[in-house]
Amino acid sequence: MSDTLSVCGLTICRGSKLRTMLPVPGTEIEIPLTIINGAFDGPTLLVTAGIHGGEYPGIAAAMELGRSLDPQEIHGSLIMLHPVNIQGFWARREFIVPEDGKNLNRVFPGNPDGTLSEKTAGLISSSFFPQADFYVDLHSGDIHESLHPYVYYPCLLYTSPSPRDISGS
């Protein structure tokens, strides 16, 4: 890992954090961006939240994560876009980008010469996916949906050995 991380013309030194607004090329739209370049070597994780503007829990989680992590304690880098569909967020639109009526989640890999949804997807596909070792796209219940708390923890079934197994009989 080098001492700097470069993303979309931004350079972030090792052990530092950057919070800024990222312009979507060919538009007047800017997306909130947080980059944490950890003090130690490690992989790069890309996190997107708010592909659907009304999915508030993922947006809030990404914002809190960006605020709370100390780059001096991080191995690798974390890049977060939150909310990606900033126009849908402000307009309280559940599934679409208001300017073009498209579901941003359905237009990847995007098109730099297309509509706002396509340009946004194109920016993420061309500038962020190549940087990432891992990618997490946060989705959740939307504006009209009821959220019930739950945790899903997959694990392997483990059974204790029987006395016969232990004795070898």
What residues fall within each predicted segment?
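Short beta-strand-to-loop junctions in surface cap/lid or active-site-entrance loops
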Residues: 33-41
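Active-site/substrate-binding loop(s) of hydrolase catalytic cores
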Residues: 42-43, 56-66, 70-160
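Single conserved hydrophobic/aromatic residue that forms the stacking wall/gate
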Residues: 158-169
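Short glycine- and acidic-rich boundary segments immediately preceding or forming the N-terminal edge
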Residues: 1-28
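Short gly/ser/thr-rich secondary-structure transition/capping motifs
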Residues: 27-30, 117-119
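Short HxH-centered metal-ligating active-site micro-motif
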Residues: 49
